[in-house]
Amino acid sequence: MNLFLVLFVFSFSVSQFFAVEAGGRKHKHQEVCIGSDGKGHQLNQFWYDNGNCRRFYCYKDEDGLVIEQTTNCELAVAENDCRIKPGKAGRYPDCCPSVECPQESKAS
């Protein structure tokens, strides 16, 4: 029974310190952000994952939680005669794909 109580208190403490929610990771009482890459990052500064074309940002909310925000490319949907144009190599958002449509022929 004591082991169960210890495990319950420990798991509750861990869940209060670290929570993963939609939109990012949250940490309490930290002055740096431990990003999803496992590295420490300064608050209120961007960092990038060029291989996966993502941008990250950490900030403190009104409750003192440090929140990691991840920004991905928008969904590119090509309809009709349009096509998906791959993004350039490099940082977000330049690496994101875009939709390219042919220009309509102008009547002479």
Swiss-Prot record:
It is found in: Secreted. GO terms for cellular component: extracellular region. InterPro entries: SVWC_dom (IPR029277). The keyword Signal applies. GO terms for molecular function: toxin activity. Keywords: Disulfide bond, Secreted, Signal, Toxin. It holds the Pfam family SVWC. Its main location: secreted. The keyword Transmembrane helix does not apply. It comes from the Eukaryota. Residues 1-19 form the signal peptide. Expressed by the venom gland. Contains 4 disulfide bonds. Belongs to the scoloptoxin-16 family. This is U-scoloptoxin(16)-Sm1a. It comes from Scolopendra morsitans (Tanzanian blue ringleg centipede). The lineage of its organism: Eukaryota, Metazoa, Ecdysozoa, Arthropoda, Myriapoda.
